[in-house]
């Protein structure tokens, strides 16, 4: 359908138009970037194994920071200061989720993630936090598995959440067992990254393949979380996943400045049912426009799904009718 490529062009064009004027790279860093662990030795060690609690904001952010630090040398040929590292999109998206309250407990049964309680806590009931778990743990553990970290594959263990433990994996072995295809895609990305002949566009291709595969593996496991949010926020969550697929299709470059500008167009807080874009008064014009485009994408996707279902039903009914006619004639 012609609308979808057009939508991607409009959205990417909106982000590209906002790129001017960003020169201080330190301003683009995610929240509490400097306070996050920057090397494996910053984590607790037990029996020669690094123990990481990904349900604490700083510890999960540290996983991203270490990946960025360890892969910086491979991106030096594209630009100085690691600005062209296409892994920046992951921590910047995570930082946006934290800053906008999307990692907090949406049920409000606990004070996890709230300023009035444990503001560093990441709630396992958060849809955003659960999907981001896999967008942090799988690339991190694949980096370990592919040799980027310089340690053996059995030297890192992630701690489980307080509930729903079986929904997650915690080390290279268990994640490989649960998500073999996706872990292979992350490994392929890192292996190609380490090649002296790696090209920027091909790196984007491998990265987006791994990214979208990660979401596809896990999106259905957390559909029950939609019930914890307003209809507007749940709609936005579904739209966000669709947007990722289409940004992947055009190989959107998730470098530092571009990813930072991308976040500028995202909603600055959790959506309420009273929010109607483009008329949300505490959103910028850019944020209102982006939300309109995202909502439109979800509506079009639903329409396409409905049409495909109807066509399938027509084909099925026609086939059954033809079979009955053949049986009567024979």
From Swiss-Prot:
A Pfam family reported for this protein in Swiss-Prot or TrEMBL: Leg1
Known tissue expression: Detected in saliva and in hypomineralized dental enamel (at protein level).
Domain of life where this protein originates: Eukaryota
Taxonomic classification: Eukaryota, Metazoa, Chordata, Craniata, Vertebrata
Reported function: May be involved in early liver development.
Keyword terms of this UniProt record: Developmental protein, Glycoprotein, Secreted, Signal
Coiled-coil residue windows: none
Keyword Signal part of the UniProt annotation: yes
Naturally occurring in which organism (per UniProt): Homo sapiens (Human)
A GO-annotated cellular component: extracellular space
UniProt similarity note: Belongs to the LEG1 family.
Primary gene name: LEG1
Signal peptide as annotated in the record: 1-20
Subcellular location: Secreted
Name recorded for this polypeptide: Protein LEG1 homolog
Sugar-modified residues: 24, 69
Main subcellular location: secreted
